Amino acid sequence: MSSILIKNGLVVDTEWMRHYDILISGSKIQRVAPSIDYSTLPHDTTVVRADGLCVLPGIIDAHTHYHLVSRGTVTADSFEEGSRLAAYGGVTTVVDFADDNKVSLLDSLHQRRKEMVPMAIDYALHQGVYKYRPDIKKELESIKRAGIGTLKIFTTYKDVGYLVDDREELKTIFKDAKDLGLMVSVHCEDDKIVTELSSSWKGQYRPIDHAALRPAEAEAAAIEYVGGIAAELDMPVYIVHLSSRKGLESVRKLRMQGVKVIVETTPHYLFLTKEKLEGPEGPLYVMTPPLRTEDDNEALQEALVNGEI
């Protein structure tokens, strides 16, 4: 395989920025130095002049939903299109999700990997677990052997079969994951709160109402629920797409109790507010959890800067 020499770029590392040359061979960085002599390299080495440009490590996006099939529709980006767009934006690795929608978790994983063949960048998968099985530990063992390191659990969406609503069954899944060295990540919204609000709702179902029907209190309650299970088992828990100050306060409360809570958020919860749900373009901003307030934006931004997220 031919080599690539990136010349005189401003290389950005965690602690420093310097003008360096980078030699890449076999898709791996072989050497980083102030100056690499082209004449010492194979004759077919490609030289990329990076004068005046920054050279950064590729971004890893640990939460993507390409070609997600749900409720009779599918997300806009295919694996091929989405991964090419990611590459143009500097994202070189994504971690998507295998649904729990086949006879076994391993079957679901194999099917998802077949669908991901057109990917233009590196990828991995989290495995969704949407229902309890008596042989759940054997199933988890099989997907771990197949390369899975992270599970995805929901505390909502009972109506579409994503919710393991029996606490002891959910605790068993957590314990088996701990025994096998698997991380459990959780979409946190309390389904009871969401369901009760929806069933008693007297107004219309407009995009802006989505924020009222899935409030920050639901996120906070679910975080404390799964955090309690993690505390009982002395294991970490990973909260995906944190959206609110109240949710952040629940995370802080758990951490004060000694629970290891890992948290991610997303650009839309950092910078957009529920006002985007108003008007003719409102449907384009419907997501779950919903967009919140400017106060929530500011709380998450501060937590990101200080390392809580």
Could you say what each language-model-derived stretch is?
Residues 9, 22, 27, 52, ...:
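Divalent metal-coordination and catalytic microenvironments
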Residues 115-129:
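A glycine-rich helix N-cap at a beta->alpha junction
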Residues 51-118:
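Metal-associated gating/positioning segment near the N- to mid-region
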Residues 1-42:
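N-terminal metal-binding scaffold of metallo-dependent hydrolase/deaminase domains
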Residues 75-83, 133-143:
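Short, acidic/polar
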Residues 94-96, 124-127, 236-241:
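Short catalytic-loop micro-motif centered on adjacent basic/acidic residues
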Residues 135-309:
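Histidine/acidic residue-rich metal-binding segments in metalloenzymes
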Residues 37-56:
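Active-site metal-binding motif and surrounding structural segment of the metallo-beta-lactamase
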